[in-house]
């Protein structure tokens, strides 16, 4: 049930991390026989109760559980999708095993948010549309902001044909609207379809992400 428990927590309770930690610490000294939530399974044994307590304590700290990369992209004609797939390919070549790739136009944001919470790194890719960030990516970032998402590492790739706005918009969001977010690598702005001369830029970004993954330490919250 862990995946669905995380999806419920991050999308419904995620905004209220400090309150969750306070509540857990207040009851941590009590002898709890069972937890019967409105959603999900009933936790009946000391082992499962301790397990879900520690999960909620960790999730409410807004820190990742595992090293890995979530690639979230929006694409109008398939060009940004191709770039996202190339990023995944280059990361795989460098030995990164935990890679999740999502089309923000097709996947419910709750699933992407759950994995963004779980993994240390995220890559966001989107095109410019009407001199703004592509709406489905704008919505995804808005959802993350509303849930107080923080303490993660993100890389950014914009895509445009005539005028560029997506890359700058995503950089502004993650540097101004979120707490403790680290931009990994140089934000990229690819013009139209992915071309041969763009590959070194993608490869360099993959190098930077892999180096950041290797340097990242996972901290586990304690009661």
Model regions and ranges:
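Cofactor-binding loop segments of dinucleotide-utilizing enzymes, especially the Rossmann-like FAD-
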Residues: 73-76, 104, 158-159
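FMN-binding flavodoxin-like domain, especially the glycine-rich phosphate-binding loop
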Residues: 1-42, 86-102, 112-223
